[in-house]
């Protein structure tokens, strides 16, 4: 529960007009030496404007996704999945291939993702890297 003083102050603030509220915000910025909106707006604009370019440059972890496996190449793809994913059993690899689209490797470096993509694509799998 808020004290009576806080409750009374809150009721006073509710009664302010929009112009009075703007004046209050400006005075509070001057008195306390803070800025209410500038850092948020600058960060928001920079993040929104640079997001696509920054995401492409800064991505360090990738996910290799098995999008599809042609029926006539499933055996080769299952073998390739077992080579790419260490410690994966035959049944798990078969379930992964038959359950496509599914991630094969997650949180890997670009080089590792490219190597996995190359091995799986060579076996005939449809692969995507995100």
From Swiss-Prot:
SUPFAM superfamilies: ClpS-like (SSF54736), Ribosomal protein L7/12, oligomerisation (N-terminal) domain (SSF48300)
InterPro entries: Ribosomal_bL12, Ribosomal_bL12_C, Ribosomal_bL12_C/ClpS-like, Ribosomal_bL12_oligo, Ribosomal_bL12_oligo_N_sf
Cellular component, GO annotation: cytosolic large ribosomal subunit
Presence of keyword Ribonucleoprotein: yes
Single GO molecular function: structural constituent of ribosome
A GO BP annotation: translation
UniProt keyword terms in alphabetical order: Ribonucleoprotein, Ribosomal protein
Keyword Transmembrane: no
Signal peptide segment: none
Entry function: Forms part of the ribosomal stalk which helps the ribosome interact with GTP-bound translation factors. Is thus essential for accurate translation.
Record text on subunit structure and interactions: Homodimer. Part of the ribosomal stalk of the 50S ribosomal subunit. Forms a multimeric L10(L12)X complex, where L10 forms an elongated spine to which 2 to 4 L12 dimers bind in a sequential fashion. Binds GTP-bound translation factors.
Family: Belongs to the bacterial ribosomal protein bL12 family.
Name of the protein: Large ribosomal subunit protein bL12
Gene name of the record: rplL
């Amino acid at each position: 529960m808020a004290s009576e003083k806080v409750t009374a102050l809150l009721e006073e603030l509710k009664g302010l007009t929009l112009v009075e509220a703007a004046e209050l915000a400006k005075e509070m910025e001057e008195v306390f030496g803070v800025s209410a909106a500038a850092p948020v707006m600058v960060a928001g604009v920079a993040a929104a404007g640079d997001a696509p370019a920054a995401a492409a440059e800064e991505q360090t972890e990738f996910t290799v996704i098995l999008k599809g496996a042609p029926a006539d190449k499933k055996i080769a793809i299952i073998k390739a999945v077992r080579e790419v994913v260490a410690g994966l059993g035959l049944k798990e690899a078969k379930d992964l291939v038959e359950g496509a689209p599914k991630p094969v490797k997650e949180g890997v470096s670009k080089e590792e993702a490219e190597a996995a993509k190359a091995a799986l694509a060579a076996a005939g799998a449809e692969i995507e890297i995100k």
